[in-house]
Regions:
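A cross-family signal for N-terminal binding/gating loops and helix N-caps
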Residues: 1-350
Length: 350
């Protein structure tokens, strides 16, 4: 049973949302940041955005249906408050390790700001009947409808009708699991914060806001994951030849030479080892697909290579593994191994 609840969002007023919306500051060059701050008085990057009433606070707890579309794809999901307890007890499934230092950094940010500015991306399994519930809500006029310079159309609907709210709550109450697609550190830091504030609160009831974190929940069919490459510092005592023999249990292996190589489909990985790229095709007959998590490439890599062969049980606290999300540049798969930082790297299909 997954717990979701409506919440009172702090959000831009309808007439200013297109000007307020912003990518993470890290996504901009210094010149772009300067231009936005100099020429857009409503940008989210300004410290005064709340003081000047550019933002409003919702009067009643609400869910939010958020849709992003471009010429190629449409993604639609629900922004809701999700339970820290679900994260701790495994209802919300994790498939990535986290770095303790970053968890603490994010927790300090939450303590300082008291603000969830970016939701955790959660996946739930597709359900046609629930799709119809969302479609009916979307027949109303959206609260927001605007385009951004990356040629995406953004639309958002408020869900404040009690019947519709109860339908959403009821659907997720019947879901056995939710899956983190992005935001492992954000959710882990929310759990840390909840523990700290619970310890400080003698009258803790479990219903306080710190027991929840903001999430964007989308169906599995709407999920598109960017590549997030893995780097391992050693072969866990194996020679290169022994390692390749071990891999053969789960994968059909093809040597692709020294030229950069990317995987082409699901259940297919690229590997760079000893100056050469390899393609790894999963032998599906040798692997058990038993739930939605087991179908994710990241989980397949863990269950077939990282844990059984390379001996990495705890992705959270193992300094032998590194990550990078080079969405446009696969060169790091090669350079991070050639320069001696790592022994082997794995690339996955975005």
């Amino acid at each position: 049973m997954a717990v979701v609840k409506p919440f009172k969002a702090v959000r831009p007023s309808r007439d200013k949302v297109a000007l307020v919306s912003s990518k993470s500051y890290e996504a901009y060059t210094y010149a772009e940041l300067g231009a936005k701050l100099d020429f857009n008085p409503f940008t989210f990057l300004h410290k005064e955005f709340k003081k000047n009433r550019i933002f409003i606070k919702e009067k009643t707890p609400s869910f939010y249906i958020y849709e992003i579309s471009d010429l190629d794809d449409t993604y639609c999901g629900i922004i809701a408050a999700t339970s820290v307890e679900d994260f701790k007890n495994g209802v919300i499934k994790k498939h990535e390790g986290t770095i303790k230092k970053r968890e603490v950094l994010f927790e300090n940010y939450l303590k300082t700001t008291g603000f969830n500015a970016e939701p955790v991306l959660l996946m739930y399994e597709d359900d046609e009947n629930f799709d119809k519930v969302i479609s009916i809500i979307k027949e109303a006029r959206p609260e927001y409808e605007f385009s951004t310079t990356d040629k995406k159309l953004h639309r958002l609907w408020l869900v404040q009708n009690e019947q519709e709210i109860n339908k959403i709550i009821s659907f997720f109450n019947k879901e056995k699991s939710l899956y983190i697609a992005d935001g492992h550190h954000r959710s882990a830091s929310s759990a840390l914060l909840a523990e700290d504030l619970k310890a400080e609160n003698k009258n803790h009831k479990g219903t306080e806001n710190y027991n929840y974190f903001m999430s964007y929940l989308i169906p599995e069919s709407h999920l598109k994951i960017s590549e997030f490459n893995r780097f391992i510092k050693d072969l866990n005592g194996h020679t290169v030849e022994e390692f390749l023999i071990e891999l053969d249990t789960y994968f059909k292996i093809e040597n692709r030479g020294s030229n950069l190589y990317k995987p082409s489909k699901k259940y297919h990985f690229s590997m760079y080892l000893d100056g050469e790229f390899y393609s790894l095709y999963l032998r599906k007959n040798n692997y058990t697909f038993n739930d939605a998590l087991s179908k994710l490439d990241t989980e397949i890599l863990y269950r077939t290579i990282l844990q059984p062969i390379l001996g990495i049980d705890d992705l959270n606290n193992n300094n032998r593994i590194g990550y990078t999300n080079d969405k446009l540049d696969i060169l790091s798969l090669k350079t991070n191994v050639d320069n001696g930082l790592y022994k082997v790297s794995f690339g996955m299909l975005p």
